[in-house]
Structure formats: structure tokens, C-alpha cells
Amino acid sequence: DEEDGEMTLEERFSEWSEPXTVQGAVDEAEALLIEKINHXXDVNAKDNLTPLHSAAKTALHAINDDLDMVR
């Protein structure tokens, strides 16, 4: 069962001591995506990255706001 290896959102949050870790994860994911796009030379993928990046930033702000309320 694949789900056994996956952590719940709560478990992942409990491992993050600071929101900056979330930012690091977003940056890392973005860097990996850009690297894949550059290797594949897929022009369309670059266009698709922009809305994805916007969504990631929006989620990051929401997570930071939630963490601020918890403190």
C-alpha cells in the first residue's frame, strides 16, 4: 500500500520548525521543475510553470498565515 509511506499534512507540519523551511521546499521544487524543463527543452512547459509558481506562492502565503495564527 503506497499510502503507508506517505505522511499526513499534520505530520509534515510538525517537522517544520519554521515557515522558512516551507519556503525552502517551494524553492527546491521550483528549481527541480526548471531543471527538468531546461533538460527537456519543452517550450510549452515554461508557460505552464508560471501558473504553477503563482499557485505555490499563494499556498506558501496561506501556510505562513496559518503558522502565524498558531503561534
Curated annotation (Swiss-Prot):
Cellular component, GO annotation: extracellular region; host cell presynaptic membrane; membrane; other organism cell membrane
GO MF term set: toxin activity
Tissue specificity: Expressed by the venom gland.
Biological processes per GO annotation: exocytosis
Keywords in alphabetical order: ANK repeat, Cleavage on pair of basic residues, Exocytosis, Membrane, Neurotoxin, Presynaptic neurotoxin, Repeat, Secreted, Target cell membrane, Target membrane, Toxin, Transmembrane
Intervals holding ANK repeats: 25-36, 37-45, 47-57, 58-62, 63-71
The keyword Secreted appears for this protein: yes
Recorded superkingdom: Eukaryota
Primary location: secreted
Localization, UniProt: Secreted; Target cell membrane
Sections of the chain in a coiled coil: none
Domain notes: Two helices (H2 and H8) are predicted to insert into membranes and form pores by assembling into tetramers. The helices are contained within a helical bundle domain that undergoes significant conformational changes during pore formation to allow exposure of the transmembrane helices and transition of the toxin from a soluble monomer to a transmembrane tetramer.
Entry's family note: Belongs to the cationic peptide 01 (latrotoxin) family. 04 (delta-latroinsectotoxin) subfamily.
Anything else known: Iso and Leu residues are assigned by comparison with orthologs.
Quaternary structure annotation from Swiss-Prot or TrEMBL: Homotetramer in membrane.
Function text: Insecticidal presynaptic neurotoxin that induces massive neurotransmitter release at insect (but not vertebrate) neuromuscular junctions. Native toxin forms cation-permeable pores (with high permeability to calcium) in lipid membranes locust muscle membrane and artificial lipid bilayers. May bind to insect neurexin-1 homolog, insect adhesion G protein-coupled receptor L1 homolog, and insect receptor-type tyrosine-protein phosphatase S homolog, and induces neurotransmitter exocytosis both by forming tetrameric pores in membranes and signaling via G protein-coupled receptor.
Protein name from the UniProt record: Delta-latroinsectotoxin-Lh1a
Native organism: Latrodectus hasselti
